[in-house]
């Protein structure tokens, strides 16, 4: 039940190089196939190369069309896309930048917006993330990360909820997907 989760869909913790961007594709496809509704998937990254990589994976898997306009060029275009109920939007967290000292405006009160945040441990604890949550107060959020913030604060879990999938470095080495890493001090 989405209401009980308070917009926290969870943390998808898979080690680097394990295919998190394809997991985003599978997640979006499954939601569209299994749950009725007119969902908007907002895919957030913090680097242009990641934004392009994830967008290309959605194109290659034919979830979206090659020429579909879904990567806003600036904050204004992002706001326009959100208000026109596009199915998929790929953008940088930086497009939620706003004048210092001013409150970010609400862009949509829809509860069928699902925000997929790539590398959530890097961007989700400061002003830009707070602006995004102010802009989309009823959205549902899921984190994709290879490095969740752990320890006593467990910030990633506080912002996104419990783990929905875990595949850590040790599991990847054991499965043969990752070569083990050894360090030898020589100084």
Locations of the language-model features?
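RecA-like P-loop NTPase motor core of helicase/translocase proteins
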Residues: 1-187
């Amino acid at each position: 039940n989405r209401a009980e989760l308070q917009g926290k869909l969870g943390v998808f913790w898979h080690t680097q190089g394990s295919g998190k961007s394809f997991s985003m594709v599978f997640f979006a496809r499954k939601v569209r196939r299994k749950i009725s509704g007119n969902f908007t998937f907002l895919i957030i990254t913090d680097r242009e190369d990641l934004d392009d990589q994830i967008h290309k994976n959605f194109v290659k898997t034919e979830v979206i069309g090659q020429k579909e306009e879904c990567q806003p060029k600036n904050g204004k275009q992002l706001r326009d896309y959100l208000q026109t109920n596009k199915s998929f939007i790929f953008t940088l967290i930086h497009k939620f930048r706003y004048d210092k000292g001013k409150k970010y405006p609400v862009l949509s009160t829809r509860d069928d917006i699902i925000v997929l945040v790539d590398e959530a441990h890097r961007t989700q604890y400061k002003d830009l993330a707070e602006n995004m949550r102010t802009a989309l107060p009823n959205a549902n959020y899921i984190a994709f990360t290879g490095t969740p913030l752990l320890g006593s604060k467990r910030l990633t879990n506080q912002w996104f909820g419990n783990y929905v999938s875990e595949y850590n470095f040790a599991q990847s080495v054991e499965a043969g997907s990752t070569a083990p890493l050894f360090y030898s001090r020589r100084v």
